[in-house]
Structure formats: structure tokens, C-alpha cells
Amino acid sequence: MNKQEEENYNSSSYYYFFLDKMIHNIKFRAFVYEGEDIGEISQAILNILPEAEIEAEEAEGLMEDKIIILSGVISKKRYTKAFFNKLLELDTDKLNTDLERKIDNKGNWFLRFSKNDAFNEKWTIIDSGDSIHLKIKIAAYPARKEIAIDKIRVVFN
């Protein structure tokens, strides 16, 4: 990105236009294991993505235990923009540092939020464990890792 493009990105009106076009969609998924409350896990998802329409699907685990998979997609721009604005309130230095390993070659950004913290209305990004999985499709043309990373870093800076 050249100096002029960066100046344009940082100007207020262009910044909001840019942010509005930043994300194509957000796919989410969480597993509800035996002993967990489906209502609590659904609420945890809604605390991160308030407009989510959650679908439930039953599955069977490795030990033949019952698992419910909660999933869905957020595509409306006002909702993806609201999510990204809230994400900017988190530790953007850490998010920025993790971009290389959390974005795939097609421009998908993978984040995981703690289910327990999300239920308590706290956004905690984690690398493993019991979590809400997000797959965020960054609007990068062409859809490549480097372009997606550059777009996100412009907003972080």
C-alpha cells in the first residue's frame, strides 16, 4: 500500500466506508457437550454476535456422547461492522501479532472466544480449549492472505 492510499484509509469518512466493506461474513460455531446448558452457550454466542440466528444440529462424539453444534452466518454489513468496531476495543497489538497465523491463504480470519467469558459478556480471545469459533471472511481482492492482513493492519494502525 502506498503512502497516498494509507492517508486515504486514515481519513475519517474513508475509514468508515472502508470498515463497512471490510468483512463479507462471519461464520460461527460452538459445541455443546453433555452436561452443558444449550441456553447458556446460545447466550454466549449472542453476547458476541447479538444478531445471530443460531441453528442447532445433533452429532455424536468419539465416545458416542451426544454433542449439539450451534452455528450460523452473519452477513449484514451493519452487524459485521458493529462486530469489528467492538473487536477494535480489544488488545489490537495482540490481534495484529497473531494475524499471520490466524488468516488462511483465502483471506479467512479465524478467531476463538472463550465460551465461559462470552457468557459473562467478556470477550476473551483464546488459542485452544472450549470456545466459540469464528471464521471471518475478509473482503480482499484477490482473496489472498497478504491482502487480507494489509487491510486489517490499516484499521489497527
PLM segments and residue spans:
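Long, hydrophobic N-terminal alpha-helical segment
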Residues: 2, 9, 14-55
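Beta-strand elements of well-folded, non-transmembrane domains
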Residues: 30-34, 49, 76-78, 115-119, ...
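Short, conserved charged micro-motifs
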Residues: 37-40, 78-84, 144-147
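Short amphipathic alpha-helices in soluble, non-transmembrane regions
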Residues: 41-44, 83-90, 150-153
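A common structural junction motif
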Residues: 48-53, 90-94, 129-133, 155-157
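Short, charge-patterned binding micro-sites
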Residues: 55-79
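Mid-chain, well-packed structural core segment of small domains
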Residues: 86-121
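Glycine-rich, aromatic-bearing surface loops/beta-hairpins
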Residues: 113-157
